[in-house]
Amino acid sequence: MRRKEKEITDKYALEKIIGQSLVCRLAMSDGNTPYVVPLCFGYQGGTIYVHGSPRGKKIDMLRKNQNVCLEFDRNTKVIDAEKACDWSMQYQSVIGFGKASFVTDLDEKRKALDIIMGQYSNRAFHFPENMVRMTAVISIEITSMTGKQSGFEDQ
């Protein structure tokens, strides 16, 4: 990272940013064609879980190439100033790299869906078997991640 003073290396701090993020941006590629989608997600033990339709561009791309990049951010705010060149942004972000795989076991899919819902709610949910079968669940094992922050006094 070029700006070492903005780098976040502490694993707990990185996981806290992920845990407090509302959106995971999943980047994939098909040859020379990049594709990014914002998704609801869940995080547990170094793995990101996402879900969606079993058909579509995201699914097609992940079947061809399981290598992905992830982005999470929180505490984003524009910091204005008198001069244009002094404007800035406050943020904390995490970029992660990993490998995606499809979860097919029904019990594992339910666990992943619980983890996803746990990102947004403290409630327990029931997932009907027919809905679990119809839902694509993807696990992404994070192989590396880095964080960056700007606009915080404790940098």
Where are these regions (language model features)?
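Extreme N-terminal tail/first-helix region
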Residues: 1-20
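Charged, gly/pro-rich active-site loop segments
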Residues: 2-5, 75-155
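A short mixed-secondary-structure module that forms the rim of ligand-binding clefts
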Residues: 42-78
